Amino acid sequence: MKPDAVLGSKVTMITKEEAQKLGYIIPDNYKETSVPKLNFDRIDKILQTAYDNCLGLRGHTLLWHSQTPAWFFGIDYDADEDAVDEDTMDARIDFYVSTVMDHVMQKEKEIAGETGKIVYAWDVVNEYLHRGRAWSLNWTSVYGDMKGTPSYVKRAFERAYEMLEKYDATDKVTLFYNDYDTYFEVEDLLALVNFINEGEKAKICSGIGMQSHVDIKRPTIEEYGAALEKFMAAGYEVQITELDFTINFDTDGTDKKDPSYDYKNEGETIEEQAAFVKDFMEMVIAKQKNRDKTVSPKGITGLTIWGLYDSISWRGKSQPLLFGTSIDDPKPAFQAFLEASRTK
């Protein structure tokens, strides 16, 4: 459900009247005469497949600087034109977030009988804290650098929460802010999610998604555990959203041009990886068990491994997953994961 999957790489426009007939939500502040045509074909198929196989989905992601096409920011939805003003972009966000969520939740009702049966969480905004990358310039061309108080991030959560209210799903579906290196940027992240919730009638962002592309050397298990404690102590639900465990990875960043994603042979073994996985999982389970349930009733509610096996991983050379060449090739890390999961 990434933005480019719905919006496409090339813009196809339809009138507001056509859009409304298709069930699109056109907000009152939307002053343009047409909207981009949204493609829900892939989403609809994924929803049906998930339901047929008793699988839950997270909506990843509504706003993300990396994969929102450039034309979405230009005058007349043209990438070659100047960026629109803030009011126009606000209306586009309102239209996009509301329409996508409304479609998905309505489709859920058709397939499963009610919302929240398939999509249990939404990553409403992804990686705002790392907006300094070149591909985030489209957002800053409209809003400038709002630093710790981005109005458009807060706005996206407001629209998303309104959709949960519309479908009576505020207790069924959690809205997340999702980012990487969260274990090193705890205070910045808490400041951002607290800003999102500031002055709202409810905690519209009640979840923190911890992308966790960890290495067996970085972060330490103690650093990761300390971040978990702080997020839960602040009253947030936590999900570990993109977990893998690299070995022989260039953690000092000296080889950033390596197309194999910073592989660096340091003689680390899959047995060392397995030991780390066991310690890591035992730590996560202990943090969940020992949390203050009056402050964080839910605590850690999800853990997503970022891929099936090493040979198709985005960091395959660093062997980050629980299986090797195929799903029929379990590594020692898989057994370690299972052993830790049995911890009482």
Segments predicted by a language model, with ranges:
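Generic structural microfeature
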Residues: 45, 95, 117-118, 203, ...
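Aromatic-rich peripheral "rim/lid" segments of glycoside hydrolase catalytic domains that contact
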Residues: 12-26, 111-114, 123, 127-146, ...
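Short, contiguous strand/loop micro-motifs
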Residues: 32-34, 213-215, 267-268
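His-enriched metal-coordination microenvironments in redox/metal-binding proteins
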Residues: 59-61, 212-213, 306
